[in-house]
Amino acid sequence: LHGVHRRQRQMCIRDRAYAIQDNLTLRYLELKDNFCIGKKVGCTSVAAQKQMNIKEPFHGNLFYRYSSRNINLLNSKNFFEPYVEPEISFRIKDDINISKAPFKFKDLDYLLDGLFCSVEIVDFRFRKPLSEIGALNVISTNGASEFWIRNENLIKIKDVDLNNFEVSLLINDTIVDTGNTKNVLDNPLNAVLWLINNLAEKGEPMLKGQFISSGSCTKAFRIYPKSKIKADFNQLGSIEFEYI
């Protein structure tokens, strides 16, 4: 019984964190020429969940004003303590009918119309180590999502083995980490399925043309001014930019 009450308290606290995120979202949407273009999923690796002391991912929003297609330069003045994360992203095929939820893995064939390379810049505006910040603070600040960069080359999902696809992160032409899509809940599609069903429980459908950034394939790396960043997705392409 004590365990049940503890889980209920944790769920209530988590709901409050998302309520704060929702209020923040309204502030973002008040900005000129801004709208929500999709969702990000965070904490999709076992290591990240252990570090944050949680047992499932969390989500945040992607915004038009805080995203770009293949940007060349990123200005450090707009960030506090940024980290770069190479991610596989997906596009929603049609408005999702959440009355059919919960969806199964096989349903993703008709829910999604392709994947592409992306990079998320996460930024923690707390003067504490991540382990002390905690997942709830990260959730309330939009999952720490600060900027999102995407490749325009849409690829058929069936053409990629997402159970085992290698992704490398280079900083100043040096490979700092080689990751794999299996680091993202064993397969990034699992993160997508979790998100769609989680949102459906809240009565929130994803809409045609929106994006889902599924979680980092590598470790997150801090970036500093005067750095050249490259996320190499092999045959899927790459994303390169300078952090100035």
Outline where the language-model segments fall.
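Glycine-enriched loop-and-adjacent helix/strand subsegments that border the catalytic/binding cleft
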Residues: 18-22, 27-189
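Catalytic-pocket segment enriched in acidic/His residues
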Residues: 141-143, 148-244
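Gly/Ser/Thr-rich beta-alpha loop segments that engage phosphate groups in nucleotides
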Residues: 5, 44, 217-218
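Single conserved hydrophobic/aromatic residue that forms the stacking wall/gate
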Residues: 1-13
